[in-house]
């Protein structure tokens, strides 16, 4: 019973609502371009542009979806798609605030769970637009999605197709250069409590943020262990 209590306490300490992000105004727009592959006919785009209030406007325009394995969940994943186009290499959902699946509120969802917050992709062709208050186009934000990827799943979780999130307007510069600059931004100084660590988490891409989350988890568990 003691260990169950410790586990629940650790889970509670690590999980938290994502803050509303209103820092995207003036940031470059991003896009995920889906192309047909030998295993998937899905093609189209998901665009991310700054909304007037600083949140993110999302525009989905897809076709070629299979007729018999929908509806289709889709998420921002924490790693980019490699040159091999292996969607499994994108690893887990983008989840900088340790949200949960099937959460009761949008803030409690994983930041990258677009389907959980806004509904699954439906039908063989699909178009929709919505604003998302929790992802960000600002490179300095913990919720920044540039350089990550989007994966479209079948209703059983199979990964059907995936695409990297890159700059929409090449006038802002080379997409790879921009994402690299974000990835190489310096880490901030460590602090003594997990809450302070969370509020000053380093900038960077999904790989760096996954490491930070792991360090936070280890720190909380260590504090709990010291108390028993």
From Swiss-Prot:
Cofactors (names): Cu cation
Cystines in this chain: 87-162
A family per Pfam: Sod_Cu
Expression induction: Induced during yeast-to-hyphal transition and by osmotic and oxidative stresses. Expression is also increased when cells were grown on nonfermentable substrates as the only carbon source, in serum, and in the presence of neutrophils. Down-regulated by shikonin. Expression is controlled by EFG1, NRG1 and RIM101.
One GO cellular component term noted in the UniProt record for this chain: cell surface
Binding-site residues, Cu cation: 75, 77, 93, 153
Propeptide: 206-228
Subcellular location(s) of the protein: Secreted, Cell wall; Membrane
Catalytic class of the enzyme: oxidoreductase
Gene Ontology BP terms: cellular response to oxidative stress; cellular response to superoxide; removal of superoxide radicals; superoxide metabolic process; symbiont defense to host-produced reactive oxygen species; symbiont-mediated evasion of host immune response
GO MF annotations, alphabetized: copper ion binding; superoxide dismutase activity
Highest taxon of the lineage: Eukaryota
Catalytic activity: 2 superoxide + 2 H(+) = H2O2 + O2
UniProt region (Disordered), positions on chain: 176-204
Description of activity control: Secreted in a disulfide-oxidized form and apo-pools of secreted SOD5 can readily capture extracellular copper for rapid induction of enzyme activity.
EC assignment: 1.15.1.1
Signal peptide start and end residues: 1-15
Keywords: Antioxidant, Cell wall, Copper, Disulfide bond, Glycoprotein, GPI-anchor, Lipoprotein, Membrane, Metal-binding, Oxidoreductase, Secreted, Signal, Virulence
Lipidation (GPI-anchor amidated asparagine): 205
Knocked-out gene: effects: Leads to sensitivity to hydrogen peroxide when cells were grown in nutrient-limited conditions.
Cofactor note: Binds 1 copper ion per subunit.
SUPFAM superfamilies given in the database record: Cu,Zn superoxide dismutase-like
Family label: Belongs to the Cu-Zn superoxide dismutase family.
Subunit structure of this chain's protein: Monomer.
Functional note: Superoxide dismutases serve to convert damaging superoxide radicals, a key form of ROS, to less damaging hydrogen peroxide that can be converted into water by catalase action. Degrades host-derived reactive oxygen species to escape innate immune surveillance. Involved in the occurrence of miconazole-tolerant persisters in biofilms. Persisters are cells that survive high doses of an antimicrobial agent.
Name of the protein this chain belongs to: Cell surface Cu-only superoxide dismutase 5
């Amino acid at each position: 019973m003691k260990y169950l209590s410790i586990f629940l306490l650790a889970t509670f300490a690590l999980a938290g609502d994502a803050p509303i992000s209103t820092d995207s105004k003036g940031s470059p727009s991003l896009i995920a371009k889906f192309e047909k592959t030998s295993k998937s006919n899905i093609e189209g785009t998901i665009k991310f542009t700054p909304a007037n209030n600083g949140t993110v406007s999302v525009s989905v325009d897809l076709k070629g979806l299979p007729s018999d394995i929908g509806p289709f969940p889709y998420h921002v994943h924490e790693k980019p798609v490699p040159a091999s186009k292996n969607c499994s290499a994108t690893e887990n959902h983008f989840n900088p605030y340790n949200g949960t699946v099937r959460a009761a509120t949008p803030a409690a969802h994983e930041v990258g769970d677009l389907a959980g917050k806004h509904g699954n992709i439906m039908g063989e062709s699909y178009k929709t637009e919505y604003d998302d208050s929790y992802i960000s186009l600002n490179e300095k934000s913990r919720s920044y999605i540039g350089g990550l990827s989007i994966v479209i799943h079948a209703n059983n979780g199979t990964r059907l197709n995936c695409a990297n999130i890159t700059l929409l307007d090449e006038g802002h510069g080379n997409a790879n250069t921009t994402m690299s600059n974000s990835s190489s931004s310096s880490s901030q100084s460590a602090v003594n409590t997990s809450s302070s660590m969370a509020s000053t988490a380093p900038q960077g891409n999904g790989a760096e943020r996954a490491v930070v989350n792991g360090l936070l988890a280890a720190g909380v568990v260590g504090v709990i262990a010291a108390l028993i």
